[in-house]
Amino acid sequence: MQRGKISFGKIKLNVNVPPAEPRSNETEAEDAKESTEASGNGGGFKKMDKEQMIRQIEDVAEDLESQHLKEVMGISGFGRKAAKVFDINEQIEKARVTRPGMDKKREESKPKEDDQKDEEEEDVIGPLPPAVTTDKEKATKESSKDEDSDDDDYSSDEDSDDEQSLAKRIPYTHEVQMQHGSRAVLALAGDPSGARLVSGSIDYDMCFWDFAGMDSSMRSFRQLQPCENHPIRSLQYSVTGDMILVISGNAQAKVLDRDGFEKLECCKGDQYISDMSRTKGHVAQLTSGCWHPFNREQFLTAALDGTLRIWQGLKSKEQLQVIKTRAQGGLRTNAASCNFNRDATLIAAGCVDGSIQTWDTRKMFVNTTHCVRDAHQKGSEITSIVFSYMGQQLATRSNDETMKLWDLRQFKQPLHTWTNLFSRYDTTDCCFSPDDRLLVTGESLPKGQAEANLYFYSTKSYEEVQRIPVSNAHVVKTLWHPKLNQLFVSCGNGTIKCYYDEHRSIRGAKLCVVKTHRKRQPMEMVGVSQIITPHALPLFRQEKSRTSRKRMEKARMDPVKSQRPDLPITSGQGGRVASSGGTLSSYVIRNLGLSKRVDDDQDPREAILKYAKDAAENPYWIAPAYKQTQPKAIFSEKLPADEPATKKPKTEADK
């Protein structure tokens, strides 16, 4: 039984012939005539009219043109897609041969490249040979036995392998030294992007280091004293890296921008108010401070007034919250260090009495969330308190020569305590490695020791992984930058050392080492001799060519050329003062004393004799006054030469 093909899109079932329509007798006769003509021609060509020939030629031309256009444009056709044509007989035969589920087995048993060939040649594929499965099972059994037998060996060697891998992770193959000054560097901070570094010392100076702009000489591009005569205790970049928090020995913290210009200075509290929560700021020396982990306008400060204060905003300059630290008896104790955890849900403070106190930022700061009273020796400052990057561990460094590691889930006892870590400065700190597998701290130089060391401890096995000798001075600050993978260590002699790995570290100090320092060429000293040219003399000097506007301005300034009129008569300075003056004293002085001045070069005798004849003829001052009493002038007699100029006056006794 032969079935016709089904075409989808326009579904037609044996519709090659259109449906029968009622025909007239005339149409039937014409069809019969055409069939007889076709049979008579023996299957030859039909006779076409001229119009039919032209239509077919145009159709063929259009088909060729459209096919060429499809090839150029890279498309399959215009308009609707052609309907696919399926053969029903072929589909039925395939359905009989293939059973449900056989295709999946074929795909699993053979690769995809041979599936097409196998489906055409073979209909059924048998199961895989059993030898393959038995080999796999044997291999898996043997491997499992080997793993079980080697478990003990691996467990014994795990610690040594971890220590070796941790030692390789420390970037200290190369070393670069930067000179800050001659005094101890107490503060060290790095930009979050790793482009810059800032340092502060006990000699009040703060230096800015730019790795992209420095050469092998490693000189800072800016040095300033932001807090005048106060040592810099702590520095920290904000989360965005555009501001720097400066904690000094003053009671007021400062915020600087990246270039060192002051943006904010905190308020100072009233020291005569006993309740510290009612003051607007700290009233004693600052000890520590840090930025909020993700809020760029919020930071935390701690001081010796027994409070921690949270500051919000750069414009308001007002504190947001006040946290009081309490000792065991309820008395006030001072916080020596403070810090936020990574998600800013906890604030931790290391106090002078050796206690560790934490507060939840989502609650009121009345009671502590965690409080460990005997965390360190009483009376020794906790110089550093640092959260791990994961936020589950806490490390503290104290002046009691110990460093402790704590777990926040079990906060009563420390996980481990490292001893014999001498620290002389109250800013000595510790830090975690970027993967939280190492804990790093430095020591001050003890007596009888040549060099101070930098220690690396494992946070899992608590063993010493590496010890690096730094210098013959105290090690104060340590900074392990997570992006640069470089270690920065500040020392007590004013130097900052940078350790990096040639392969594991990126940018930072590696950019400066490759740049050679260009020395300035010494300038030759040439004796300066005076050269006089004719054009320099006033006689031969020519005026410079100027524009008409400048010439007019200069002429306007000249009172002669501009024909300035006389200034008004005033008694003040700058005007044409009246000849008689504005007051009686000025009138007397000008008319009687200074109106007729006597020159120093003139002979006074000649000046007087000039008026002698006039005075004798027309006496006005002296002659009329003595005319009645002494009409004849009496002059002094000439004394003999032997007599002294002054004689002793005669008395009545002598007479």
UniProtKB/Swiss-Prot annotation:
PROSITE patterns: WD_REPEATS_1, WD_REPEATS_2, WD_REPEATS_REGION. GO terms for cellular component: nucleus; site of double-strand break. Gene3D superfamilies: YVTN repeat-like/Quinoprotein amine dehydrogenase (2.130.10.10). Residues 1-54, 83-165, 544-580, 633-655 are annotated as: Disordered. It comes from the Eukaryota. Disulfide bonds: none annotated. Residues 147-164 have a biased composition (Acidic residues). Keywords: Repeat, WD repeat. Pfam families: WD40. SMART domains: WD40 (SM00320). SUPFAM superfamilies: WD40 repeat-like (SSF50978). WD repeats lie at residues 180-219, 227-268, 281-321, 330-369, 377-416, 422-467, 470-510. InterPro entries: WD40/YVTN_repeat-like_dom_sf (IPR015943), WD40_repeat_CS (IPR019775), WD40_repeat_dom_sf (IPR036322), WD40_rpt (IPR001680), WD_repeat_GAD-1 (IPR051858). Belongs to the WD repeat GAD-1 family. This is Gastrulation defective protein 1 homolog. It comes from Drosophila melanogaster (Fruit fly).
